[in-house]
Amino acid sequence: MRVTAAARSLLLTEFVSAFFLAMRYFFKPKPTINYPFEKNPISPRFRGEHALRRYPNGEERCIACKLCEAVCPAQAITIEAGPRRNDGTRRTVRYDIDMVKCIYCGLCQEACPVDAIVEGPNFEFATETREELYYDKAKLLANGDRWEREIAKSIELDAPYR
């Protein structure tokens, strides 16, 4: 027993086996990506930066039902509804989301009956101040306009699971 242990120690068998294992992985393609220049594909269910969507005719989708405000566990959404129109519909006067409070749970998106509020594919929205993370209606609509194609595609891919 002592002789085999001494032979292993003298011949450095563990070191040699570890070296060959390292060399095998050294020449394989790397599993990491060069992040700012390469990006992994994002799941259709990814929950990123919030956006308010519009109908194809340009009218905003939000009907001021306030379900998203009621269901938000972090109480990050504030909505003020405008007066009823002649056709009986309402629109929001104020729609604010405090992204510092938001926990990105997606309950607002699930509660919305007209798919007005969605969480888009953007995850790169770091800011220098906290005030920039307080999104108003104009910022949310701009996000919706910017990411509409990706958001519509994600909703279409996720439709069988809704």
Swiss-Prot record:
Its cofactor is [4Fe-4S] cluster. Binds 2 [4Fe-4S] clusters per subunit. Keywords: 4Fe-4S, Cell inner membrane, Cell membrane, Iron, Iron-sulfur, Membrane, Metal-binding, NAD, Quinone, Repeat, Translocase, Ubiquinone. [4Fe-4S] cluster 2 binds at C72, C102, C105, C108. Its EC number is 7.1.1.-. It is found in: Cell inner membrane. NDH-1 shuttles electrons from NADH, via FMN and iron-sulfur (Fe-S) centers, to quinones in the respiratory chain. The immediate electron acceptor for the enzyme in this species is believed to be ubiquinone. Couples the redox reaction to proton translocation (for every two electrons transferred, four hydrogen ions are translocated across the cytoplasmic membrane), and thus conserves the redox energy in a proton gradient. InterPro entries: 4Fe4S_Fe-S-bd, 4Fe4S_Fe_S_CS, NADH_quinone_OxRdtase_chainI. [4Fe-4S] cluster 1 binds at C62, C65, C68, C112. GO terms for cellular component: plasma membrane. This is NADH-quinone oxidoreductase subunit I 1. It is a peripheral membrane protein. GO terms for biological process: aerobic respiration. Belongs to the complex I 23 kDa subunit family. Residues 52-82, 93-122 form the 4Fe-4S ferredoxin-type domain. It comes from Rhodopseudomonas palustris (strain BisB18). The keyword Translocase applies. HAMAP family: NDH1_NuoI. It holds the Pfam family Fer4_7.
